[in-house]
Amino acid sequence: MKNTAITKQVQEALLPNNVLQDLLEGNNRFVSGSMQTVDNSALVNQTVGGQFPKAVVLSCIDSRVPVETVLDQAIGDIFVARVAGNFENIDILGSLEYSCKVAGSKLVLVLGHESCGAVKAACDGVE
C-alpha cells in the first residue's frame, strides 16, 4: 500500500532515468489492472506542509486520460500540466520550469494519446 509521501530527501536522491522507469511501471500496472492501493488520507496529511513531486507531466486535457490514474501515481507524486493537444505556451512553460527549478522535479514527461481531437483539428486546419 502506498501510504508514504515523497520527502525532500527522497526527491533529491532520485535520478531522471529511475523516475521514468517508475512512471512506465505505473502505466504497466494500470494496463494490467494491478494498480497499487493508496491511503489518500495519510498522503494528504503528509503533504499539507509541502510537496516534492518526482516529475512533471505535460498532457492533453482529454477526459479519457487521467494522468495520475494511467501512470498509477498518488497524491504528491507528480505535477500535471494539461492543455489541449499537449501544446507548450508561455504559461505551460512557466509551470514546467517551476516544477523543475523551484520544486525539484527530476523529469519532464510529455504524455500523448491516440485519437487526439485537438491534434486532428490543428492538422485539419493546415493550408
PLM-predicted stretches and their roles:
Residues 1-2:
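Disordered regulatory segments flanking catalytic cores
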Residues 5-87:
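Short, conserved "active-site rim" segments that organize catalytic pockets and cofactor/ligand binding
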Residues 16, 67-127:
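Short HxH-centered metal-ligating active-site micro-motif
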